């Protein structure tokens, strides 16, 4: 992390972001803004962002922290100290965006309430990221990627009959961070027309419902309950991982035109591509059979 802001460039040049952030979701959101040219001031506690201590793979620094915090400046503030609270207020007086990801009760103790921020900084765009929302019984629960994958139904769609498989990336953290950045950009655009800021209350739980949207919609409208489908798609075929002689092959065919090209150029089976029955019912037809170990396709 640099001690001075980089040369202004990009669509957000001139925008200052104050980010009270730890872990992944908040830091990723502010890093997206920094990549667009915003001047991001990262506020950390004395012990530093949690992610600083996750590993030491980048010249002694954490790979997660390096990935999430490029192009930012950093300052240490203890928000329980009156002098540091006053320093934060001075930062906010010159800021365009405030981003913070912490439990709702912790935010309230730090004075980061909707009422105060909207009253004292009416043009400030504020984005609060929590695990489960700022109200309700779950508002102060800690949110971890694994738990959210389970609670939002994502793990009900992975794996097979032997059980669920956690996604190999931190989907909930990353997805929420990107969602937060998008909402902040929208609020900045709105402010450019109205002069008014906005308070964005985003939970990781609700952000993850976007990833299960088709499943929720199918169930709500037709009672269809998608289950675990290993590496296949519920509606599109062939779309998955197929076994070959020397390993596995990823195939994704979305529509009939691609199916015809695939049959002609890859399978050397133009007749299959021209077969109307296979064209509409290709899932149950021959794709898995054509990719058995020892087949010509392998």
Feature names for model-found ranges:
Residues 1-193:
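N-terminal helix-loop segment corresponding to the beta1-alpha1 unit
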Residues 6, 64, 198, 237-238:
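Residue-level marker for the onset of beta-strands and adjacent loop->beta junctions
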Residues 48-50, 220-226:
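Short Pro/Gly-enriched beta-strand edge/turn motifs at strand-loop
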Residues 78, 100, 201-205, 251-253:
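Active-site-adjacent beta-strand anchor residues
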Residues 134, 161-169, 192-208, 227-234, ...:
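Conserved Rossmann-fold dehydrogenase catalytic segment
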Residues 170-185, 204-212, 254, 258:
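Mid-domain beta-loop-alpha active-site segment that forms a flexible
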Residues 177-197, 210-222, 263-270, 274:
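Oxidoreductase and adenylate-handling cofactor-binding alpha/beta cores
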Residues 237-298:
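Aromatic-enriched alpha-helical interface/lid elements that frame and gate functional surfaces
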């Amino acid at each position: 992390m640099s001690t001075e802001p980089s040369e202004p460039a990009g669509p957000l040049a001139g925008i200052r972001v104050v980010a009270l952030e730890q872990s992944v979701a908040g830091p990723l959101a502010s890093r997206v803004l920094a990549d667009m040219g915003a001047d991001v001031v990262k506020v950390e506690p004395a012990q530093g962002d949690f992610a600083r201590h996750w590993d030491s793979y980048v010249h002694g620094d954490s790979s997660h922290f390096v990935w999430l915090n490029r192009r930012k400046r950093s300052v240490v503030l203890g928000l329980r100290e009156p002098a540091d609270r006053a320093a934060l207020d001075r930062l906010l007086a010159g800021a365009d965006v405030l981003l913070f990801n912490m439990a709702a009760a912790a935010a309230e103790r730090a004075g980061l309430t909707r009422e105060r921020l909207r009253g004292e900084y009416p043009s400030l765009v504020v984005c609060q990221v929590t695990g489960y929302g700022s109200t309700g019984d779950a508002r102060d629960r800690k949110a971890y990627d694994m738990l959210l994958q389970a609670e939002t139904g994502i793990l009900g769609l992975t794996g097979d009959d032997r059980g669920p498989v956690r996604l190999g990336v931190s989907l909930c953290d990353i997805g929420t961070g990107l969602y937060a950045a998008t909402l902040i950009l929208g609020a900045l655009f709105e402010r450019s027309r109205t002069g008014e800021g906005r308070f964005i209350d985003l939970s990781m739980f609700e952000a993850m419902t976007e990833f299960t949207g088709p499943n929720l919609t199918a169930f709500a409208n037709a009672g269809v309950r998608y289950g675990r489908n290993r590496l296949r798609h519920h509606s599109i075929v062939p779309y998955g991982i197929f076994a070959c002689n020397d390993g596995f092959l990823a195939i994704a065919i979305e529509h009939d035109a691609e199916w015809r090209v695939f049959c002609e150029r890859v399978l050397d089976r133009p007749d299959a591509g021209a077969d109307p029955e296979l064209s509409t019912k290709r899932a149950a037809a021959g794709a898995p059979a054509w990719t058995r170990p020892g087949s010509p396709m392998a």
